[in-house]
């Protein structure tokens, strides 16, 4: 979807289980010369991926690069700002690694991909994990009871408990977890290379987390920031994981990090 009519473009990538429409929130701070192009990630909205490839031949980094390159070339966009939230943050980091020369700025909002969760690795990369998860698609009660027991034993934070219940509450959501995890399982950034590309190309960069986010906590940001030669500090907002929020919009507007006009 496109918001605005300006030639200065922000390409925006949403989070897991969400949609491109989430970025309508930023319409309030668009200047006349600016526009937002928000796309639905694969398996989300009206974006599809061949079902025959999900288990055996997932999306590769090269395919992701060529898809976006062809897309922006078709639209006649030479350079663009890149904004990624949660899962979209992981996809944005891969793009920044592969095509830094085309970025005007990079904003990562609670990005996935700073570390690989062992559950994700087990389900997406092992045959046993896939078989086990496919059984959960039809019969999720046992895994939900296990999550509740871990919460009762205080092993699991209540926000993580709620997050799991929300993600697995319907069969369509459980299928989306399986499809999205497997389709994108090869798309993880190389953090040291990403930091070097950002610095070499002088890309204005901001990393934003929610103070109360238990899904992707701010401490994960150290895994990326330690690779920069110059010191970078993450921005902490008084929010949880739902960071596509008016507070974030206000912060980016006030600090000038929303679609900055030029690289320093």
Enumerate the predicted regions with their spans.
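Conserved alpha/beta-hydrolase catalytic His-Asp/Glu region
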Residues: 139-199
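Catalytic histidine-centered segment of alpha/beta-hydrolase-like enzymes
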Residues: 215, 236-250
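Post-His helix in hydrolase/transferase enzymes
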Residues: 220, 244-258
């Amino acid at each position: 979807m496109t918001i605005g009519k300006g030639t200065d473009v922000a390409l925006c990538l949403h989070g897991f289980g969400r949609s491109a429409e989430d970025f309508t929130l930023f319409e309030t701070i668009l200047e006349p010369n600016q526009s937002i192009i928000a796309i639905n990630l694969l398996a989300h909205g009206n974006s599809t991926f061949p079902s025959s490839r999900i288990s055996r031949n997932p999306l590769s980094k090269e395919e992701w690069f060529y898809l976006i390159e062809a897309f922006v070339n078709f639209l006649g966009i030479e350079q663009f700002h890149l904004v990624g939230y949660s899962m979209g943050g992981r996809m944005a980091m891969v793009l920044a690694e592969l095509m830094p020369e085309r970025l005007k700025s990079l904003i990562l909002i609670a990005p996935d991909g700073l570390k690989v969760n062992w559950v994700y690795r087990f389900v997406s990369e092992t045959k046993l994990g896939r078989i086990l998860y496919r059984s959960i698609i039809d019969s999720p009660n046992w895994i939900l009871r296990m999550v509740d027991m871990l919460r009762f034993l205080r092993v699991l934070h209540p926000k993580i408990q709620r997050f799991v219940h929300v993600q697995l509450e319907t069969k369509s959501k459980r299928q989306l977890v399986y499809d999205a995890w497997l389709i994108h399982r090869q798309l993880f950034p190389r953090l040291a290379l990403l930091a070097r590309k950002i610095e070499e190309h002088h890309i204005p960069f901001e990393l934003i987390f929610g103070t109360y986010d238990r899904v992707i906590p701010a401490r994960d940001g150290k895994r990326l920031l330690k690779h920069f030669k110059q010191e970078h500090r993450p921005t902490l907002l008084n929010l949880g994981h739902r960071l596509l929020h008016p507070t974030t919009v206000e912060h980016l507007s006030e600090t000038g990090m929303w679609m900055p006009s030029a690289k320093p």
